[in-house]
A protein has these predicted regions:
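Helix-turn-helix DNA-binding elements, focusing on the entry/boundary residues of the two helices
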Residues: 24, 35, 46, 61-64
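Short alpha-helical DNA-recognition segment
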Residues: 32-50
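Short, basic-rich loop-to-helix N-cap that marks the start of a DNA-contacting helix
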Residues: 56-69
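Short, charged recognition helix plus adjacent turn
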Residues: 78-107
Length: 107
């Protein structure tokens, strides 16, 4: 689906984008970096950093990870998304995960 025909992001997603953007900005400032310096370290443009800090959701996941790496916070991201680091994931740790999930019939 192209960006031009995507549905608007739900409010919780927009809030999370702004929160992540604010966190990136705070980390950048804590590291004493300008937007340009961070962009150079991450191999992106300064405008990409500006967009990320403003909560622009069109930035690719790889770019987010490169910026997190440049800020020294990359290690925390995979852990934050690890299902076994959550209560639900731990509860289901004994369940066998299927190799493939098939759509359920609605009939």
């Amino acid at each position: 689906m192209s960006a031009s025909n995507q549905q608007p992001s739900p409010l919780p997603v927009r809030r999370a984008l702004r929160e992540v953007g604010g966190s990136l900005q705070t980390w950048r400032k804590l590291r004493g970096l300008t937007q340009g310096q961070l962009a150079d370290r991450a191999g992106v443009t300064r405008m990409t950093i500006v967009r990320m800090e403003q909560g622009d959701g069109t930035v690719r996941t790889e770019i987010l990870l490169r910026v997190a790496h440049a800020l020294g916070v990359l290690d925390g991201l995979p852990r934050a998304l690890d299902p076994y680091e959550s209560d639900l994931g731990r509860l289901r740790a004994d369940d066998r995960l299927p190799k493939r999930v098939r759509p359920r019939s609605l009939t």
